[in-house]
A protein has these predicted regions:
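C-terminal motif of bacterial Sec signal peptides marking the signal peptidase cleavage site
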Residues: 21-23
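Short, well-ordered beta-strand elements
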Residues: 32-42, 99-104, 121-124, 169-170, ...
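N-terminal lobe/hinge region of extracytoplasmic solute-binding protein
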Residues: 39-94, 229
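Aromatic- and charge-enriched surface segment that lines or borders ligand/interaction sites
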Residues: 53, 87-140, 170, 321
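Gly/Pro-rich hinge or "lid" segments in bacterial periplasmic/extracellular proteins
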Residues: 73, 177, 185-257, 261
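Alpha-helical secondary-structure segments
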Residues: 118-124, 166-170, 260-261, 278, ...
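Surface-exposed binding/hinge segments that line
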Residues: 120, 137-210
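Ligand-site clamp/hinge motif
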Residues: 242, 248-294
Length: 335
């Protein structure tokens, strides 16, 4: 399928690393800081990495957090995994057929100055695998040894993810999967989280919910993004119902390749189009196919880009427990 988008909005794909923001048009604010404003659709449904399903939500989180690996464009425009929060990774094939990956972290820091540790990844991955959280992205870790047992028993310590030291993370897979680094270790769902921060913000949210009024929305630990502690190139500095502003995370420890200030605007497609035409924002996504097709004919700054996407159908039907029925359905498909 094709996703139609503006030339200036190429940076919005969740598979594109933050460095591509330099390819977008940048403006300078009154104080000389480079800034970029982007419309990303509806107001985010969540800032919790294990629940973020919308591309807009994932795009924001991709700028707030940094995973073990990140994606870059390699030869033939293929996405390749390169070190992110990790500075190196080693792979060892074991005699029982399992494969062990050892990640050595680069010594990055969270936005509050605390060191990023291997335990932050252990906590995040165990939280994702926990059946109690009910994340649709949990199967990402199904190739990790102990995942099935953890899912069945609820004992997340069975997941073969451990901190050998504060800067060494060890992950054992059930076998060899060449897409592990590219797909799992760059995913929004496996981004690191600070357990102490999540627990503190959750306690505060629960306390606020005790006095919740009938017409108020229950608070979650992530409800105020400006209080999130992040390890990526940006941290949230301001939020209202129409936009979220990110500013450079000075504790990030790497040279920032994008603008110092990044604003994600929220609204419907019509609002986004008006803001773009008025020069309020630099890029918009998404628009309806009709609007985009019309604009492409009249505006040379538009172009079509192919995007690879995979969709799956999850059946919640007891009749499909019968293997013969599933085989019959499979035979119907003209391959």
């Amino acid at each position: 399928m094709k996703l139609w988008k503006r030339l200036t909005a190429l940076c919005l794909s969740v598979l594109v690393c933050v460095t591509l923001l330099t390819a977008c048009g940048r403006k300078e604010s009154a104080d000389g800081r480079a800034s970029l404003s982007v419309c990303v659709g509806e107001t985010p449904a969540t800032y919790d990495p294990i629940y973020a399903q919308r591309i807009g939500d994932q795009t924001i989180l991709n700028h707030l957090y940094e995973n073990l690996m990140r994606l870059e464009t390699g030869e033939n425009s293929q996405a390749i995994a390169v070190p992110g929060a990790a500075k190196s990774v080693d792979m060892k094939e074991n005699s029982d057929g399992t494969v062990t990956y050892t990640f050595r972290l680069r010594g990055g820091k969270w936005s509050d100055g605390v060191e990023v540790t291997a335990s932050d990844f252990v906590y995040a991955w165990q939280r994702l695998a926990d059946p109690a959280t009910g994340s649709v992205y949990a199967p990402l870790l199904s190739i990790v040894s102990g995942y099935a047992e953890a899912q069945a028993s609820g004992d997340i310590s069975l997941l073969a993810v451990s901190a050998k030291s504060s800067t060494t993370l060890v992950v054992t897979l059930t076998g060899h999967y060449d897409w592990f680094l590219r797909e799992v270790c760059t995913s929004i769902a496996t981004m690191p989280l600070r357990q102490d921060v999540v627990q503190r913000l959750k306690q505060e949210a629960d306390a606020a919910n005790d006095n919740l009024k009938e017409d108020e929305t229950p608070r979650r630990w992530w409800s105020d993004p400006t209080r999130l502690v992040t390890n990526g190139p940006y941290t949230a500095s301001a939020e209202d119902e129409n936009a979220l502003t990110l500013t450079e995370n000075t504790a990030y420890g790497k040279k920032l390749t994008g603008p110092e200030d990044l604003t994600f605007c929220f609204g419907d497609t019509q609002t986004a189009e008006v803001l773009y035409d008025q020069g309020v924002v630099d890029a918009v996504w998404p628009l309806t196919e009709e609007e985009m097709a019309e604009q492409m004919e009249a505006d040379e700054t538009w172009q079509a880009e192919p995007v690879l996407e995979t969709y799956s159908v999850m059946f919640n039907c007891s009749r499909l427990e019968d293997e013969s029925i599933r085989k019959a359905l499979s035979l119907v498909i003209d391959r």
